[in-house]
Amino acid sequence: LAVKSAVKSAVSFTADFTGEVQRFIGISLSGGKADKACVAVVEHYPKFKKIFLSKIFEKIKTEAELSADLKIHDFIQGYEGKVESVAFDVPWIRPFCNRCDLPCPGYESCQVEHIQWMRKHNQLEQKKKKPKKLFTPYTERSVEMYLKTEIEEPMNFGPALGANLAPLLARASFIQRRLDLPCIEVFPKLSIWRIGRALDISKTHLRYHRHSTSGNESRRVILQALTSNNLAFVYEQDFRLMVENNHAFEAFICALTGYLRYTGQTEARPAGFPSNEDWIEFPKEKLRFPT
């Protein structure tokens, strides 16, 4: 009932709407030859103090001579000049070490800012571990090392150029470089955790929203909390789609994180964090939504 009530409100609300709108796009990528990529568009109406999921473009695949990458680009480009941010769920820039053009002494003795930070951070963490491991700055970034150790919930942050993320980074880079829009990086699992805890959702649901057997129910609970609290308006068919399709759900979460960043509700870089390194946008622990 709460879902249907929120859906009815969304239909009535958008039918009557006139005025300013702020848009945020979220992208959940899959492998370039797969058909799982999704794009979501979230709209914020300051006059009405409402957030609305206006569109989901799902299961984007290559057809004949038309690539899925071009479909994604054209869809986003249609909003050029009307979007505050485009949020990718993967990195699109190679680790800084991999792009450095300075004479290389080896990362064991390199004095570049981010290498010094990574070395110090790694040394502090390795004091607690056996066997000790050295970091690899050509595959991983400072932000991944930071988030692995400094947030309240342990999460697996794979290296940007690790086996799992490297193909997605290449695809995101290809798409992003053609866009003339502000782009940010989001780690959906962390955004879901922070948003869910702010809504007092069970930790089990937040930890297993991707699970093959219980993920659908976890996504339903999370979406129910957002809609029943009037924090986001979602059409019923989109609600069902996001319950059934995790890529669609995470694209929505990426776009929603873009809204939180726009309203100053994502975490800033910590003091001393390398100035030339990438950053992942993720929500603060305490959030305020439009009411």
Language model segments and positions:
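Intrinsically disordered, low-complexity segments enriched in serine/proline and basic residues
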Residues: 1-18
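RNase H-like (RuvC/DEDD) metal-dependent nuclease/polynucleotide-processing core
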Residues: 19-25, 29-291
